[in-house]
């Protein structure tokens, strides 16, 4: 079976599962394991790595920087800027600090982490300057809802936004009402963070759901793999789960070979229905 690929900016094709790094870099005793997991993921073809200056206050970027040693050219590297750094010289300084921690001289993609301190015009201008300086190749956004995207799209250069990274999983389908169809219409990929839901009752409910486990049994895979396969079954959607161990990253990579049938997708739809109306954008 052919692996599912996602097009970024029309010029880069990447596997529909990438590697997230939220919570990496917080525990020094886990660093070697985290680096090894990221490197294993790269070798398995999970070549997009997503990080942020926020994660572990820059610690996750340092872990990624170590993992990239000798492998930088194989990787599509994504980082994110705090809203209060996303304009003017602050954006230049923040990007340069991320590059130092990542031990690289460019990012493939730089995202506004969420909207806030700067007007979109200022953020777009800063992103364009960073591209001109060769520090980033593309820019995008995260945690922007449909109305935000309409506002961004009206600005000069706003339609150069390469992606929107949002929370999306079987138990949180709000983006399917208007945001996801609009992104698909623009042929702009959506990066799904927390594709297995955040830890706690919601995630446990998804992983223990009878329908999810029936499908897992039919494919001889785990419930978590079913949830990931569901996310990437949607046109133009990439999942970026975190895997802190090599075994976990191997399971994530295997999802690229899983194809849920239309009947199985219908069963999951019935268990966790799509929204009938507009809901506020979920974010964590």
Curated annotation (Swiss-Prot):
Disruption phenotype: The deletion mutant shows sensitivity to glyoxal. GO terms for molecular function: oxidoreductase activity. Pfam families: Aldo_ket_red (PF00248). It comes from the Bacteria. Induction: Expression is not significantly altered upon methylglyoxal addition. Its EC number is 1.1.1.-, 1.1.1.2. CDD domains: AKR_YeaE. GO terms for biological process: methylglyoxal catabolic process. Keywords: NADP, Oxidoreductase. InterPro entries: AKR, NADP_OxRdtase_dom, NADP_OxRdtase_dom_sf. It catalyses: hydroxyacetone + NADP(+) = methylglyoxal + NADPH + H(+); a primary alcohol + NADP(+) = an aldehyde + NADPH + H(+). It is an enzyme of class 1 (oxidoreductase). Belongs to the aldo/keto reductase family. Aldo-keto reductase that contributes to cellular methylglyoxal detoxification by catalyzing the NADPH-dependent conversion of methylglyoxal to acetol. It also exhibits activity with glyoxal and probably plays a significant role in detoxification of glyoxal in vivo. Can also use aromatic aldehydes such as 4-nitrobenzaldehyde, 3-nitrobenzaldehyde and benzaldehyde, and phenylglyoxal. PANTHER family: ALDEHYDE REDUCTASE, OXIDOREDUCTASE, ALDO/KETO REDUCTASE FAMILY PROTEIN. This is Methylglyoxal reductase YeaE. It comes from Escherichia coli (strain K12).
